[in-house]
């Protein structure tokens, strides 16, 4: 399925990711069940509510299949905001929250405050230059394991990281008109 990218469509802003992919000429396939992952080389996990995403992914059999495929190296992942939380090894203060655990990162939910404290900030992204970040109840990566590369920071805080074919951002690139981060992920995934 070259040219097709899955977007986890259980909850959150999956439509915005589909639009971002469409602008790049890439077909987006909504993933709501384990069977929808068949043939995909790449999956985007959108922002939304991380607890809900985790519970539904587990309930619909998606969690185990995604974990297996990532560990085999046959699936690239891009998690934004709540999606990044779901990818993390640990969620600070929420040890029981469902998570995929494929990114060696310890993530703090809502680290920049509540919805009313959302903000936008220009970031320097390694290899891309200046990129406009939209932070909405954004998480932050408090600790990173071996092999996790920081691609962008807000002050001293990592807000965009990569480990192999797993990419995770605290911010929402899908809420901008800038396609570069989605294009970077497509290249990472070989799509």
Swiss-Prot record:
List of residues binding L-glutamine: 48-50, 109, 136-137
Keywords on record: Glutamine amidotransferase, Hydrolase, Lyase, Pyridoxal phosphate
Protein name: Pyridoxal 5'-phosphate synthase subunit PdxT
Functional note: Catalyzes the hydrolysis of glutamine to glutamate and ammonia as part of the biosynthesis of pyridoxal 5'-phosphate. The resulting ammonia molecule is channeled to the active site of PdxS.
Catalysed conversion reaction: aldehydo-D-ribose 5-phosphate + D-glyceraldehyde 3-phosphate + L-glutamine = pyridoxal 5'-phosphate + L-glutamate + phosphate + 3 H2O + H(+); L-glutamine + H2O = L-glutamate + NH4(+)
Any one GO molecular function term: glutaminase activity
Family: Belongs to the glutaminase PdxT/SNO family.
């Amino acid at each position: 399925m070259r040219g097709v990218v899955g977007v986890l469509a259980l909850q959150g802003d999956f439509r915005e990711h589909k639009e971002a992919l469409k602008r790049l000429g890439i077909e987006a396939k909504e993933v709501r069940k384990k069977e929808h992952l068949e043939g995909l080389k790449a999956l985007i996990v959108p922002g939304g509510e991380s607890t809900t995403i985790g519970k539904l992914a587990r309930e619909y059999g998606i969690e185990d299949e995604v974990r297996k495929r990532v560990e085999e190296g046959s699936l690239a992942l891009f998690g934004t905001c709540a999606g990044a939380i779901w990818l993390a090894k640990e969620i600070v203060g929420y040890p029981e929250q469902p998570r995929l655990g494929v990114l060696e990162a310890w993530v703090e939910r809502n680290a920049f405050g509540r919805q009313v404290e959302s903000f936008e900030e220009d970031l320097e992204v390694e290899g891309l230059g200046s990129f406009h970040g939209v932070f909405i109840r954004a998480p932050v990566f408090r600790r990173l394991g071996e092999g996790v590369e920081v691609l962008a920071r807000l002050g001293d805080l990592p807000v965009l990281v990569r480990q192999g074919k797993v990419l995770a951002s605290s911010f929402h690139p899908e809420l901008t008109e800038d396609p570069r981060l989605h294009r970077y992920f497509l290249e990472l995934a070989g799509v």
